[in-house]
């Protein structure tokens, strides 16, 4: 009953959806693998919301975040979009208003967000490699014929966790196979992997030297922390107590819903498409090379049945068909050219002391306005 606020976190491997009420209470949540199609997963969640939401309730504001933020926002015409760090902070602050450190481990990324005086002060991310994240554990669980839930459960009773360090996945894979040959149990391997995920986060991403540097109010989140073994590994390695919300995996979506709630103003009409249009919408995806310049960017063009489109892969605005705005954006190269060479030399009659040639090379080239003024005036 009343106003509802929709938050969508289109992640790299999973899609999360949250619906919040007027007081920030969680009314609905969705968490599932997107199988490479976050938009399809979002529509699936909206079908569930439509089936469960009474007529006395309505979605009045919406916000997206995550890897697919712009795609989902463009497809559904959502009201707002926000970067992941802010969305995660809003969610963490809802559970602990004094939070000063947020550790988020997702499917293919991990980040540490430090909060100072109520604002984001620093963000540390894993770099190009995604080893040691949630999909890393999932891959090993499947290779050992276990579900992720079973794999996490057996880790809690492991007697001799194997030491895998925090190296590259390729080397760790070899280490796991070697441990199996030496008789290590699945539980020992799972516990070792849980330790390695935390070691990677603390020592490779955050580059921690003293556990006290993490802060006094730590919130851990991300789907990987649904794994109790990972949470326990964090507590044992860092020696810190952390808050893990029971909705750790959908904190990005929940934070987006809270942002949608905060930015909503009485009487505001949502720009989000009606659910009937969303359910009837189709998407046509094609790829082409941009011919705007010599980069020849590979563009992915998503065309929606309602006429809108969303383009990715472009390195500049030419790729999305935007023309340069000559009225508002100055052409600095054109300005530099005219500023440098739009000087009229003295006539032969006035140049009584002869002619001096200024080479258009090196720093003399850019210093020509100085030399012209110095010699002429």
Name the predicted role of every residue range.
Residues 90, 137-139, 246-273:
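Glycine-rich phosphate-binding/hydrolytic loop that grips phosphoryl groups
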Residues 174-203:
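Adenine-nucleotide phosphate-binding core of ATP-dependent small-molecule kinases
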Residues 66-68, 196, 212-235, 248-249, ...:
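Glycine-rich phosphate-binding loops at beta-strand->alpha-helix junctions
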Residues 34-39, 117-160, 249, 262, ...:
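Glycine-rich phosphate-binding loop plus the immediately following alpha-helix
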């Amino acid at each position: 009953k009343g106003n509802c606020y929709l938050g969508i976190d289109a992640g790299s491997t999973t899609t999360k959806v949250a619906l919040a009420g007027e007081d920030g209470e969680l009314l609905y949540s969705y968490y599932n693998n997107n199988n490479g199609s976050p938009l399809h997963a979002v529509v699936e969640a909206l079908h569930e919301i439509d089936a469960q939401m009474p007529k006395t309730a309505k979605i009045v504001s919406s916000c997206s975040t995550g890897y697919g933020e712009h795609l989902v926002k463009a497809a559904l015409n959502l009201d707002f979009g926000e970067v992941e760090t802010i969305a995660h902070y809003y969610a963490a602050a809802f559970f602990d208003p004094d939070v000063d450190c947020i550790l988020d481990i997702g499917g293919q990324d991990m980040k540490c967000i430090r909060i100072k005086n109520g604002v984001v002060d620093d963000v540390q991310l894993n770099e190009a490699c995604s080893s040691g994240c949630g999909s890393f554990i999932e891959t090993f669980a499947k290779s050992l014929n276990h579900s992720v839930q079973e794999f996490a459960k057996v880790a809690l009773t492991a007697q001799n966790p194997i030491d895998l360090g925090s190296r590259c996945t390729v080397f760790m894979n070899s280490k796991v196979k070697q441990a199996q040959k030496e008789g290590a149990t699945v539980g020992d391997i799972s516990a070792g992997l849980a330790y390695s995920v935390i070691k990677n986060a603390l020592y490779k991403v955050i580059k921690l030297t003293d556990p006290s540097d993490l802060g006094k109010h730590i919130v851990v989140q991300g789907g990987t922390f649904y794994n109790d073994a990972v949470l326990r590994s964090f507590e044992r390695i860092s020696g810190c107590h952390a808050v893990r919300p029971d909705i750790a995996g959908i904190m990005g979506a929940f934070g987006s819903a809270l942002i949608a709630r905060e930015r909503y103003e009485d009487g505001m009409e949502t720009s989000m498409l009606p659910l009937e249009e969303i359910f009837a919408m189709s998407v046509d995806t094609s790829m082409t090379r941009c011919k705007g310049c010599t980069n020849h960017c590979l563009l992915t063009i998503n065309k929606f049945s309602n006429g809108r489109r969303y383009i990715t892969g472009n390195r500049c605005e030419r790729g999305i068909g935007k023309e340069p705005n000559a009225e508002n954006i100055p052409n600095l190269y054109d300005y530099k050219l005219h500023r440098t060479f739009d000087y009229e030399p003295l006539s032969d009659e006035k140049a009584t002391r002869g002619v001096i040639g200024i080479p258009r090379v090196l720093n003399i080239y850019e210093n020509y306005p100085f030399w012209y003024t110095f010699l002429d005036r």
